[in-house]
């Protein structure tokens, strides 16, 4: 159980909630270019388990690494940090 605290935790935006109990989250990170020093934005999509289907498209959520739940799903929804504003 000591590994539990060392699991990766990411904050990202939900881009899809069309699957049952699954959301797709885009996590954006910035890295410094090695030669020129400019900050470059990288993004990566993760599928996360949403047991109660509470996250909606546009929400900012926090996800945590977990055991493999399917072939592509290795993260679990921890909390909805900020709900999307519907206009």
UniProtKB/Swiss-Prot annotation:
Keywords: Ribonucleoprotein, Ribosomal protein, RNA-binding, rRNA-binding. SUPFAM superfamilies: Nucleic acid-binding proteins. Disulfide bonds: none annotated. It holds the Pfam family Ribosomal_S17. The keyword Ribosomal protein applies. The keyword Glycoprotein does not apply. GO terms for cellular component: cytosolic small ribosomal subunit. InterPro entries: NA-bd_OB-fold (IPR012340), Ribosomal_uS17 (IPR000266), Ribosomal_uS17_bact/chlr (IPR019984), Ribosomal_uS17_CS (IPR019979). One of its GO terms (molecular function) is rRNA binding. GO terms for biological process: translation. HAMAP family: Ribosomal_uS17_B. Belongs to the universal ribosomal protein uS17 family. One of the primary rRNA binding proteins, it binds specifically to the 5'-end of 16S ribosomal RNA. Part of the 30S ribosomal subunit. This is Small ribosomal subunit protein uS17. The lineage of its organism: Bacteria, Bacillati, Bacillota, Bacilli, Bacillales.
């Amino acid at each position: 159980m000591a590994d539990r605290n060392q699991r990766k935790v990411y904050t990202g935006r939900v881009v899809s909630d069309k699957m049952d109990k699954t959301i797709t989250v885009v996590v954006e990170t910035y890295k410094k270019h090695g030669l020129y020093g400019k900050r470059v934005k990288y993004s990566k999509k993760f599928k996360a388990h949403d047991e109660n289907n509470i996250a909606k498209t546009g929400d900012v959520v926090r996800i945590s690494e977990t055991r493999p739940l399917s072939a592509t799903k290795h993260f679990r929804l921890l909390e909805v940090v900020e709900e999307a504003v519907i206009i």
